[in-house]
Amino acid sequence: MENNNELKQLEEKELSSELIYSGTLLNVYRDKIELPNGKTTGREYIKHNGAVCIAAMKEDGSVAVERQFRYPMHRIVTELPAGKLDTPDEIPLEAAKRELREETGITASSWTYLGDMIPTCAYSTEIIHMYLAEGLEFGDRDLDEDEFLNVS
């Protein structure tokens, strides 16, 4: 938790902001800022709507995982079901329910909010909202046309 004195010592203040790239997933900005010592510098960062991540707990105590090729990494990775918020004001729990069903075909009768994670705060505004899903029922997936993944 921050206090006012610490905020005065550490806060960087925006002087100007420029959108340098606008995409379907994220927007990139370049801001001119004033440092706590009064000097100015630049910051480049990504504005992101946010995301959700779901630990879908099966009856045997294991969790559902996905395997998919992640282009930036150029390899197949194992992940928990997750997805982005469609809009900045989308309710995270609704996004979590949607993403779990679309990607895995799983619906859950019980949802527990686990907290938020900020994975890359040095250069992104993305916040990942974490949920535990229990009481699972398995059905058909509804993947986006550009999604290819395996679920176990």
Model-assigned labels for residue ranges:
Residues M1-L10:
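Basic/polar N-terminal segments that are highly enriched at the extreme N-terminus
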Residues Q9, R43, C53-R98, E147:
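Conserved Nudix-box catalytic region and its N-terminal flanking loop in Nudix hydrolases
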Residues E12, S16-C53, E59:
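Acidic, metal-coordinating catalytic segment for phosphate/diphosphate chemistry
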Residues S16-L19, D116-T120:
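Short, solvent-exposed loop/turn elements at beta->coil junctions and helix N-caps
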Residues Y29-N37, T120-D140, S152:
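Active-site-adjacent beta-strand/loop module that shapes the phosphate/pyrophosphate-binding cleft
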Residues N49-A51, E145-S152:
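NUDIX/MutT-family hydrolases
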Residues E103:
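Short alpha-helical functional segments enriched in proximate histidine and acidic residues
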Residues T107-L114:
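A short coil-to-beta-strand element that immediately follows conserved catalytic motifs
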